[in-house]
């Protein structure tokens, strides 16, 4: 085999260099996404703080390692449409992309029981390939990845490189935080942009200080793609914030529990990202509930850790977030639930059934 080694990029430093080869020729540079959030004056607040700590953090690629590998079955149905049984986290996205690929809207997608997902099945893997083979051969097709193929194909958790500075007063109250984060999104965008947005939006943690600034950039490289993974970027920045908070507690001379309790967000207060929290916020009560056992473990010399985190529920960041189902009485005289959400272990079928039974006179045994 004869091949030519093309210019390639494997680090963020290489991707950000002024003369760097571009992963995509049509792009001006290797930046996939950029996010900047600023409230108050973090620089001024940090400069006026009694205690200041700056630290560099790095987190690696992580594999989802779900038990069930990706699989799809496709065939022509009685309507002449290509019907795809899929195991992914977004049936509508699969429908959209397969329709674009095949150049027809005569495509249907139905999600089977997906099994584990954790974000690793957000992107298409075998669905479009099975559909294309059915389109060409007019035959039913099943494609299933082996474990090795699964590890090779689907995106991973983003590696993050973070520089963060925190300032506190003499009592351990956070005065300001400033951060720069860089993410390696690999050779394709996947969900690199939304992951970066979440990472920056929630990096400040569930605390009530008001001087915060973060600048985030996601870069294309020739590495394996990175995409959705539980926590969706917040895991990485939260790790940095919480570690820095532990270091600050040592510097101030108080426990990690105490520094979190003094800074904990309470109902009606405003987070560093500008969101006002509601009455469902229970961080203070949660910390109080573990204090006795935490203190006892410290006194006994046991290794004990403590961490706080927050993340969006649903879409968040101001985007409309609606959920719909279609309910149809079919020929079997049963009520069938049609939902675009995927069964990935969260008990979707059970919850939807419970909602119907609770709000109607329909019996459980009459629902499919």
Protein language model annotation of sequence segments:
Residues 1-368:
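Structural alpha/beta core scaffold segments of enzyme domains
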């Amino acid at each position: 085999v004869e091949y030519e080694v093309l210019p390639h990029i494997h680090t963020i430093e290489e991707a950000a260099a002024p003369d760097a080869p571009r992963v995509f020729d049509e792009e001006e540079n290797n930046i996939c996404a950029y996010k900047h959030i600023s409230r108050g004056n973090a620089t001024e607040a940090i400069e006026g703080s009694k205690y200041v700590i700056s630290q560099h953090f790095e987190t690696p690629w992580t594999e989802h390692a779900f038990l069930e590998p990706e699989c799809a079955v496709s065939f022509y149905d009685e309507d002449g449409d290509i019907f795809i049984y899929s195991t992914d986290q977004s049936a509508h996205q699969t429908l959209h992309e397969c329709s674009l690929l095949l150049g027809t809207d005569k495509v249907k997608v139905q999600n089977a029981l997906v099994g584990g997902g954790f974000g690793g099945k957000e992107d298409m893997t075998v669905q479009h390939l099975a559909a294309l083979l059915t389109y060409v051969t007019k035959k039913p097709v099943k494609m299933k990845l082996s474990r090795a193929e699964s590890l090779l194909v689907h995106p991973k958790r983003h590696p993050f490189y973070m520089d963060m500075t925190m300032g506190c007063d003499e009592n351990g109250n956070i005065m300001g935080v400033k951060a720069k984060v860089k993410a390696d999104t690999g050779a394709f965008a996947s969900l690199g942009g939304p992951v970066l947005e979440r990472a920056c939006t929630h990096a400040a943690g569930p605390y009530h200080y008001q001087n915060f600034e973060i600048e985030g950039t996601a870069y294309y490289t020739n590495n394996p793609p990175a995409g959705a993974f539980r926590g969706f970027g917040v895991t990485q920045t939260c790790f940095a914030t919480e570690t820095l908070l532990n270091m600050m507690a040592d510097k101030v001379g108080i426990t990690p529990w105490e520094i979190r309790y003094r800074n904990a967000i309470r109902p009606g207060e405003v987070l560093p990202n500008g969101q006002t929290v509601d009455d469902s916020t229970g961080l203070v009560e949660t910390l109080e509930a573990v204090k006795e056992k935490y203190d006892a473990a410290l006194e006994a010399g046991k290794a004990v850790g403590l961490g706080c985190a927050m993340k969006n529920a649903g879409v968040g960041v101001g985007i409309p977030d609606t959920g719909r189902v279609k309910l149809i009485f079919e020929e079997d005289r049963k009520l069938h639930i049609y939902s675009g959400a995927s069964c990935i272990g969260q008990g979707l079928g059970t919850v939807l059934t419970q909602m119907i039974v609770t709000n109607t006179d329909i019996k459980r045994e009459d629902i499919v």
